[in-house]
Amino acid sequence: MGYRKLQRTKSQRKALLRDLTTNLILNGKIQTTEARAKEVRRQAEKMITLGKRGDLAARRLAATYLRDVEDENKIKNATNAEDIVEQKAVKTLFSDVAPRFKSRNGGYTRIYKLGQRRGDAAPMALLEFVD
């Protein structure tokens, strides 16, 4: 299955998707273009599936993907394990988001089409978790 390039290099695309996925987990919904929303949905579904597993390996995999801007410098400058605090996004994923979908097998997110953006007529969408 292919993916969308979103007119970016690999590193820019990876950073964009990480940021949008983290914002979706922290805020519960994001407003972005349709193409970005469809790509973020794929990553968010994978993160929620990891959250449902709930073991240490899944937590570590989620921590490598999700980003927490405030703690990123602390992690880089950490000298021992006690200095590394668990990211807020990872905590939210495993304690709030994943338990909501314990009995659901996929389809954790929903995309609403919002119409076109005023400046460049890009198709916009609202990506949110299913209740």
Curated annotation (Swiss-Prot):
Q: Name one GO biological process term.
A: translation
UniProt GO molecular function: structural constituent of ribosome
Please give the Gene3D superfamilies that the UniProt record associates with this protein. Answer: Ribosomal protein L17
User: What Pfam families has UniProt attached to this entry?
Assistant: Ribosomal_L17
GO CC terms: cytosolic large ribosomal subunit
Give UniProt keywords alphabetically: Ribonucleoprotein, Ribosomal protein
Per the record, the domain of life is Bacteria
InterPro entries, per database record: Ribosomal_bL17, Ribosomal_bL17_CS, Ribosomal_bL17_sf
Q: Which family does it belong to?
A: Belongs to the bacterial ribosomal protein bL17 family.
This protein's assembly is summarised as:
Part of the 50S ribosomal subunit. Contacts protein L32.
Q: What is this protein called?
A: Large ribosomal subunit protein bL17
The species this protein was found in: Oenococcus oeni (strain ATCC BAA-331 / PSU-1)
